[in-house]
Amino acid sequence: MKLRGVTSALIGSISLALFTPISAQAAEPTFTVMSRNIYLGADVGVALELIPDMPAAAQFMWNQVNKNDFSKRSIALAAEIKEYQPDVIGLQEATIWYCKKNAWSKKVEVFNFTDQLLEALGGDYVLASKDGKTAFNPGYSINPIPFLTMVKDPDRFQKIFGQDKAACGFQIGDALAIKKTLADQVIQVGNTEYEASYSIVPTLMTIYRGYTWADINIENIAVRFVTTHLESIWDENKVPNAAKQATQLISDLKETNMPLVVIGDFNSDPRDPRPANAANPGLQPTASEECPAGDTKCNAYRLMREAGFNDAGPDASDPTTYTWGMNALLTGPDPDRLKSAQGMGNEYGFTDRLDYIFTKNGVDVSTSQIIGYKAPYATDHAGVLAEFTILNTLASQSAPLPEHKPFPISFWQWVGIALLALIIWRIQRRLTRA
């Protein structure tokens, strides 16, 4: 009688195990990712149009940064993050603004957007770090150059420097912020640069771009996270630098077999390069002999998809998912931009999809959505939020990604900067005497 009871119980247990859904036996690990371009605070395009009048360009940008007060924007961004609770956040345009009193003084950090955002989050998030490396890759920068980038801000500079003016510059970078609870789950971290760069002023001012990455254990499964910001400036009848940089990114990631998530502002819409007669208020790349309309080799987004990366969505071809279009002062889209956006099917004024989360190697998207597309705006981009499930739970740890470093400033670049500064100084002296 007892033997029969034991046998029945054993058969029942085996049957239960066989017919219980796998998901009920061991749930697959899940995590949430956010992509957010937090905006350096000024319209670089307008500033570039003011060059070679460097002081005017610098003052223009500084004034806009003050108007777009990040101490207020960081609170709004932090509230958004607290609402959605992403495990990992890919930040672009994580900006530091530096100023210096004179040519011989050290530069002083005046604004640090990443630190301000983390402070607004109350310590719940940190930058991924391991073995002395932090997931922050400095990219495009303009150093504070006396005479060239002098700006006037008496209220601020009197407290810091005891004078009304200072030479100011900035550095924008990519960063990976993670929940503090994941800080001890970081396996390794790296930062690297793209070989393709863009020179605004030949030999003097070069825009470097790159990416930062971290391998993090998500419920004991190692996942590789990458965040990047590809180049926005492009030249007619040339392959855009964004496409060249995407090609290198794909090459760098080709040996990664572990679950992979790539986050960022790719400065590439699926419609690029566009026919000359197509609506293009965002001034995205247009078709040419070198880059015919829709040519994959000239489109970072298409290159990623062709390389086997999955777009987490929402559907990038749907106008309601566009992420770029607010004006420089974050009051909304300009009237012409709004009209064009509404004609495309986006009621809020966004005209281009530039921000994405891509996955590969057994990372499956569960849900995705566009965030931050309604006023008030904390940045000039809408963001992307997605929840994922890890299907590839058996992959081994992949080797670290290759390291590429930017070329250091050369002797002739320093000579050029010195000569340009001298010329502007002499012009200013003559104007003062006149």
Spans of features found by a protein language model:
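Juxtamembrane/start-of-transmembrane alpha-helix segments at the extracytoplasmic/lumenal side
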Residues: P400-G416
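C-terminal membrane-anchoring or membrane-association module
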Residues: L420-A434
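Bacterial N-terminal signal peptides
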Residues: S8-P21
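Surface-exposed cleft-lining segments at the edges of enzyme active sites
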Residues: F60-K67, T192-T203, H229-A242
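Active-site beta-strand/loop signature of hydrolases that rely on acidic residues for catalysis
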Residues: V33-I38, R73, L77-A103, A214-I216, ...
